[in-house]
A protein has these predicted regions:
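Short, amphipathic alpha-helix enriched in basic
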Residues: 34-45, 87-94, 123
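Sequence-specific DNA-binding recognition helix
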Residues: 92-132
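Residues in the helix-turn-helix
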Residues: 61, 72, 112-113
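Amphipathic alpha-helical interaction segments
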Residues: 1-5, 28, 32, 84, ...
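Short, Lys/Arg-enriched, Trp-marked, Pro/Gly-tolerant hinge/linker segments that flank
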Residues: 8-35, 39-50, 68-79
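Short coil turns linking two alpha-helices in DNA-binding domains
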Residues: 54, 58, 109-110
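Alpha-helical DNA-contacting segments of helix-turn-helix folds
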Residues: 66-84, 88-89, 117-136
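Short alpha-helical "recognition helix" segments of helix-turn-helix
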Residues: 47-55, 102-103
Length: 139
């Protein structure tokens, strides 16, 4: 992306400038969308349609931006929510919260869906992660 923007700044040929401007704008827009998603992870109404509306683009355009990084909006959202939940489960400051409260705060509305996705991604259940905290801190 830096090379694309540099080509524009240095006055590349017309085709190079058009491609670079387009690529740079797409990268900047994807970055802005990802930042927005990260700030709204706990929002249970966070959808590709809602994000697209906030950025004044179509849902399909948002999906295409994520496809350029070999992922999807839904996958990005899921992985970010799982990461937040795992950090909270491992953090002693959240020891008083239940697994379901942490899942809800991370943006999951369905506990069984959360448990299934968490286990699939991390290879252990949220409860297993929570139970291992004292051992991890003692090591």
């Amino acid at each position: 992306h830096v090379y694309d923007l540099a080509a524009v700044a240095l006055g590349g040929s017309g085709d190079v400038v058009r491609v670079a401007e387009s690529h740079g704008v797409r990268a900047a827009r994807l970055h802005a969308i990802k930042t927005d998603v990260l700030q709204a992870l706990g929002d249970h109404g966070l959808t590709v349609t809602a994000i697209a509306a906030r950025h004044h683009v179509s849902p399909r355009y948002v999906q295409m931006l994520f496809e350029s990084e070999d992922t999807t909006f839904s996958r990005f959202l899921l992985l970010q929510r799982l990461a937040v939940a795992r950090r909270m489960l491992c953090d002693p400051r959240f020891a008083d919260r239940t697994v379901s409260a942490i899942a809800f705060e991370a943006g999951f509305g369905d506990l069984s869906h959360f448990n299934r996705d968490f286990r699939r991604h991390y290879g252990e259940s949220p409860s297993d992660v929570r139970a291992a905290i004292p051992r991890r801190n003692a090591s």
